[in-house]
Amino acid sequence: MNSLSYLNHELERFPSPEYALTDPNGLLAIGGDLHPTRLLNAYYEGIFPWFNADDPILWWSPDPRAVFVPGTMKASRSLIKSLKKQTWTFTINRAFKEVMIGCAAPRAAQDGTWITQDIQHAYLELHKQGLAHSVEVWDEETLIGGLYGLAIGQVFCGESMFHTQTNASKAAMLVLHQYLLKQGFKLIDAQVVNPHLESLGATALKRKDFINLLKRFRDGKVASNSWVVKEVFLEL
């Protein structure tokens, strides 16, 4: 029987994702904190936090799950044509904090943000530990787009992206796909299925199939220098 678990501030184990509610889809647990160890434990089991500023911490593992195989993002001809005209540059981990701030900025038709100050502090700590990473898009020296997420073995767990110029976030995603493929990553977790992600090539996997892939790749090895600050290039 599916039921909602309540967490305290001890670093206890998460319940199995199979116990998540079906309505709302994937809600598994409530409470706890955003301690780096708890966050890593969550992602290791296919669970992630997602909540509004005035809510308690909510933990999710939806069914189905949106995933990409690195290198399989669909780029339309119009997108490629547009990007070829740009002189943007791309970096890894050059401006993680600024990317998070960009992702947290208010958006049209959106009431508030789930990327609260507590979330920003928690993921910045994971970044300092070499576990959370960003891709940046620059127009000269102006940050115009980017994304961030966590690397768990050979799995990249995408969290959020933003843009201030058209197609900059899609460019960041293309860069991420190409980069992860070269670094030996096997899976990108895009979390919640939606039409936009599906239009870019995401697959909706049953949760149990996603968990099986996660278990297969979460302890995999990638190059130790994968996430040093560097400039990268978009291949079109």
Curated annotation (Swiss-Prot):
Its principal location? cytoplasm
**InterPro entries linked:** Acyl_CoA_acyltransferase, Leu/Phe-tRNA_Trfase, Leu/Phe-tRNA_Trfase_C, Leu/Phe-tRNA_Trfase_N
Where in the cell does this protein reside?
Cytoplasm
Q: What class does this enzyme belong to in the EC scheme?
A: transferase
Q: Which SUPFAM superfamilies match?
A: Acyl-CoA N-acyltransferases (Nat)
The yes or no answer to whether the keyword Transferase is present is yes
What UniProt keywords apply to this chain's record, in alphabetical order? Answer: Acyltransferase, Cytoplasm, Transferase
Q: Under which EC number(s) is this enzyme classified?
A: 2.3.2.6
Q: What's this protein's function?
A: Functions in the N-end rule pathway of protein degradation where it conjugates Leu, Phe and, less efficiently, Met from aminoacyl-tRNAs to the N-termini of proteins containing an N-terminal arginine or lysine.
Q: Any idea what this protein is called? A: Leucyl/phenylalanyl-tRNA--protein transferase
Species: Shewanella sediminis (strain HAW-EB3)
